[in-house]
Amino acid sequence: MGFQFEVIATDPTGARLGRLRTPHGIIETPAFMPVGTAATVKAQTQADLESLGVQILLSNTYHLYLRPGHELIRDMGGLHSFMSWPRAILTDSGGYQVFSLSELRKVTNEGVTFRSHLDGTTHFLSPEKALEVEIALGADIIMVLDECIEAPSAEQRAREAAARTLDWARRSREYFAKHGDSAQQMLFGIVQGGTYPELRRENADALVELNFPGYAIGGLAVGDSHNITCDMTRAATSRLPADRPRYLMGVGRPEQLPDYVTLGIDMMDCVLPTRSARHGCLYTSQGRVLIKNARYSNDSRPIDEKCGCAVCQRYSRAYLRHLYLAGETLAAILNTHHNIYFYLDIMRGIREAIRFGKLERFRSDLQARLT
């Protein structure tokens, strides 16, 4: 099975119901991808993720390049074999981590020199090197290297970064044409442009000329408001081809997911459900539960009485509070399982609403309960 993306239905809001076929299975879109930074979604086994219905997860090129190394993973049969995950995987290029985690980085048109956050060793990541690593990892969907900038940034700074990202996209396309396999991996270009809608549109137009099989929108939700993220996403998607999948990187909160979908987004990822779970923040159909609060000390109810996850079918808030306060590993396991289920359940609801042309009603109801 190679790659094929089809839009099955379109909602009056502009949201798309789709299906993305990959060599490791079908992804029903719009889809949310749990983040498995170092080839693991923290506190979940692969069997847990399969039981949750995860069709695709994200892993991180920067972290896997530094440890255990892409050559080792390649020699172990690639990332799917190495982590024993039979379904689809997306890897980012490592660009965001280089700019957010690394010290003493230096960016030129050739690439970026940086020091590892692990041991201080110096590394150089070019568009070609990023793809060399991603091809070795063997994920289904891979990203070009992009330059991420802080938000907000001056327009000239955003314009320079967008131009460099576009040049890197051209080089990535050329490298993949020589060394990649389009039947096994799908290469996405990334739209940049800071918080400037016209720059986003220009960058998207130029990127589309390179004819990528899919497109991501990067550099958002890194300090800017939800409204700005939506405005920049709208500017980009207005220029992207309707027959290609669109991926909004690094978003978002549960109540925001329908907003992004109405802008024509097909895929999203975020560390929020897993990171929040490890800090005792649980998402429910009536808002957040901070499980450490004393009010839950003798609460026999599940986290969410309307939730169908295995945790809510079995455990009480009182027990989960006890586990969290005692520092038990099981707290992170159960909390994470619930939060991922909650996100995936929202996505199931979104897809069903699009199918019947009722996404606006679904969005209004969800946001009324969660905000």
Identify the residue ranges that each predicted region occupies.
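Structural signal for hydrophobic packing residues in well-ordered secondary-structure cores
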Residues: G138, A169, R173-F176, G180, ...
